[in-house]
Structures are given as structure tokens and as C-alpha cells.
């Protein structure tokens, strides 16, 4: 089944939404670069599930409701969206900034979330206040970001001259929205670390083995901070495994789902 581009209205704002597949609901939350290059991964994820992949408020062609100025606000907006769509036992899959949104949603409404996969998450600060946990997007040139964030930098090459005006507007909106939501404090919520005790859903943390934007060692901090979290590296991938290794990333998520399903059935039998 091919992904279908549609939209939904939340808090009076039109939110661009990709839907694909049928089955248990999976909410895919994109990174700061948007839904660009995510469709192959979404199709794989939708093999036996219904995937909903919104463009965050202010990204893509999504409107930004008045008052939505933080990742915290986006989390509440998406929880409202799940309520409007009457979706329960939702699995969250978030990449980078999208993983931050997933964490904020899960600590606010853990009863609505059944599982969570965090791919190269940001949003929680583990180091000292004056030390960066991840590279500073606003202090390095684009070329350096590509070198840090991709195993194969060629995948990040954009031919701006060949882009339509609409595509260029999306690129600009994504960049502007990232600055709005994540510039200060840079890529984290100072309260979030102290709310992780509320997480009791099965959690898998995936990390690109070549990720230098958010160092691999940072993944262990999330594992230690989230009760029962599992950790797995994705080979030949940087900060966006869903783009560089969509098959391996989707397979890891599928195996995680199956392992939890088997464990649940064994518990029922016992």
C-alpha cells in the first residue's frame, strides 16, 4: 500500500498527515529535517500496521496553531489528535527531535501509549549545563552537519536549483520551526529528565553506529534513565537510520514488537 497524503484538523489548525497500512496504530514523529526521504521507511513500517506520520506544526505544509511554541505544546497537540481519532494502545516511533516529542507525550499520557521506539533521541540533557550533549546546528556550517549526521553524506545532498518554489518553502519552514522549538535551550527540555520515572512502557532505543551529531555514548544515558529500555545499534547509519538504513531499522522495530508480543502471551499463559 502506498502512503496517502492527507490532513487532519487539531485545535483549529490543519496538520499535514501521511497515512499508510492497516492494523495497530503507529505514530511516526519525524526529525528536524521533516518527512523528507521518510516514505520508504513508512511503507516498511506499515507492513502490518497503520502508520500515521504528521508534519509537525510549522513543518511541511502543517499550520501552527496560536500558542504552540514548544515541543511540550506539540506533545499536547498530538495527544489531542490521538483522542480526536479515537486511537489507543498507540506505538510511538520518533527520530531525533521526533523522539523528543514522543518522550514528552509518553510522560504526559502513558496510558495511551503501548510501546515506544526512540531513534537517536534528543530532548534530555545529561551533561553539565555548559557542555553540549549534541553538536550545535547553529554553530556549524551545513557541510559539517552532513559529515556528522550521515554515514553516507551523499544521501544528504540537495539540489536547491532543481527544487520547486513549494519545496524550497518547506525547507525554509522546517528550519524556522526547528529554531522556534529547539534553539533555547538547545535541543532539550530541562524538566524532562526528572519526569522519565513516569515511563513504564516497553522502550527500544536505536542509534546509528556512525552518528557523530549525537554521539553513540549518549544512547547509554537514555538506557540508564528509562526503566527497562533496550538498546540496539544500526550499522552503516548516522543520525537518521530510517533514511540511511530503512530496512534494518524497520526490521529492528518489528523484532521488538514480536518479542514483546511473545512475552505478553507467555505471561498470560503463566
Q: At which residue positions do the language-model features occur?
A:
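N-terminal cap/lid segment of alpha/beta-hydrolase-fold proteins
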Residues: 1-14
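Conserved HGGG/HGGXW glycine-rich cap/lid loop of the alpha/beta-hydrolase fold
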Residues: 11-61
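Acidic beta-to-alpha connecting loop that harbors the catalytic carboxylate
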Residues: 32, 209-211, 236-238
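Active-site loop/oxyanion-hole signature of alpha/beta-hydrolase fold enzymes
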Residues: 52-93, 251
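Flexible "cap/lid" loop of the alpha/beta hydrolase fold
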Residues: 100-103, 107-108, 114-144
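Conserved alpha/beta-hydrolase catalytic His-Asp/Glu region
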Residues: 127-128, 143-203
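Conserved serine/cysteine hydrolase catalytic core
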Residues: 183-224, 233
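Catalytic active-site module of serine/aspartate enzymes centered on a nucleophile-bearing elbow/loop
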Residues: 229-270
